[in-house]
Curated annotation (Swiss-Prot):
Family named by the database record: Belongs to the ATPase protein 8 family.
Classification lineage: Eukaryota, Metazoa, Chordata, Craniata, Vertebrata
Entry's transmembrane regions: 8-24
Molecular function as annotated in GO: proton transmembrane transporter activity
Complex formation: F-type ATPases have 2 components, CF(1) - the catalytic core - and CF(0) - the membrane proton channel. Component of an ATP synthase complex composed of ATP5PB, ATP5MC1, ATP5F1E, ATP5PD, ATP5ME, ATP5PF, ATP5MF, MT-ATP6, MT-ATP8, ATP5F1A, ATP5F1B, ATP5F1D, ATP5F1C, ATP5PO, ATP5MG, ATP5MK and ATP5MJ. Interacts with PRICKLE3.
UniProt function note: Mitochondrial membrane ATP synthase (F(1)F(0) ATP synthase or Complex V) produces ATP from ADP in the presence of a proton gradient across the membrane which is generated by electron transport complexes of the respiratory chain. F-type ATPases consist of two structural domains, F(1) - containing the extramembraneous catalytic core and F(0) - containing the membrane proton channel, linked together by a central stalk and a peripheral stalk. During catalysis, ATP synthesis in the catalytic domain of F(1) is coupled via a rotary mechanism of the central stalk subunits to proton translocation.
Swiss-Prot/TrEMBL keywords: Acetylation, ATP synthesis, CF(0), Hydrogen ion transport, Ion transport, Membrane, Mitochondrion, Transmembrane, Transmembrane helix, Transport
Family annotation (InterPro entries): ATP8_mammal, ATP8_metazoa
Membrane topology (UniProt): Single-pass membrane protein
Record has Transcription as a keyword: no
Annotated positions of the N6-acetyllysine modification: K54, K57
Name of one Pfam family that matches: ATP-synt_8
Descriptive protein name: ATP synthase protein 8
UniProt modified residues of type N6-succinyllysine: K54
Length: 66
């Protein structure tokens, strides 16, 4: 049974790493990064919960006949 020749493997691994780095750099070029991040004024919005949005009628328990 012949053995696998391992001599080209370091070159294959290095070229793969270089290619992945190159592809990553090309993909990062499409992103826009802000150089000076500005703080936005955040206004606090009060979110109403579901029970505040709709009117619910509270029923009394059924009265017992005497």
């Amino acid at each position: 049974m012949p053995q696998l020749d391992m001599s080209p493997w370091p070159m294959v691994i290095m070229s793969m790493i270089l290619t992945l780095f190159y592809i990553t750099q090309l993909k990062m070029l499409n992103f826009t990064f802000h150089t000076t991040p500005s703080s936005k004024l955040t206004m606090s919005h009060k979110h109403k919960t579901t029970w505040e949005l709709k009117w619910t009628k509270i029923y009394l328990p059924p009265s017992t006949y005497q």
